[in-house]
Amino acid sequence: MPDIEIRRAEAGDLNGVAASSAALFAEDGPHDRLRNLQWPSEHGAAWIAGLSEDPDALLLAAVTGNTVVGHLAGSYYPASPMMAGARAELVSMYVVPGLRGKGVGSRLVAEFTAWARERGATRMHVTAYTANEAAVRFYQRRGYAPLWTVLAADL
């Protein structure tokens, strides 16, 4: 396996992170007919740029050489009158298929978890499509458990 660096995304990584996000959308597309598969090309760059400048967000890149082979985007939310504890949300994560099962995703999640703990988060959330059984298993093996259920009805 090539050496893979997990780091806070740098300016030179942003196009690669955008491509990683687009790949995630393409893979998740079959799980939700309302998912706009063009969103990454239409809005992804602005979203990624905003994350990279947001002090309450973390944008990680998994990089080998000069190539982004995965990413993780997450946000921190302080305690509020509605939520008694601070929390973090893992918003987006992708690893190229050839590197799955080799620890890259685990390293991304571990880095995000450490960042969230340093900020004072007491809980982390992630959403995954129920039909994406591999993703659900991945997160469950890392201590995530169902908290609420979202049901959808097509009209």
Model-derived regions, located:
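Conserved active-site alpha-helix within GNAT-family acetyltransferase domains
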Residues: S106, E118, T130-W148, A153
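Conserved acetyl-CoA pyrophosphate-binding loop and the N-cap/start of the following alpha-helix
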Residues: L99, G103-E111
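A short helix-loop-beta-strand connector motif used in the catalytic cores of GNAT acetyltransferases and
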Residues: A46-L60, E89
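Conserved GNAT acetyl-CoA-binding A-motif
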Residues: A116-T127
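Conserved GNAT-fold acetyl-CoA-binding loop/helix
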Residues: A22-W47
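Conserved N-terminal entry element of GNAT/NAT acetyltransferase domains
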Residues: M1-G12
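Conserved beta-strand in the GNAT
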Residues: A61, T67-Y76, E89, Y94
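A conserved beta-turn-beta hairpin within the catalytic core of GNAT-like acetyltransferases
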Residues: P78-L90, R100, P146-L147
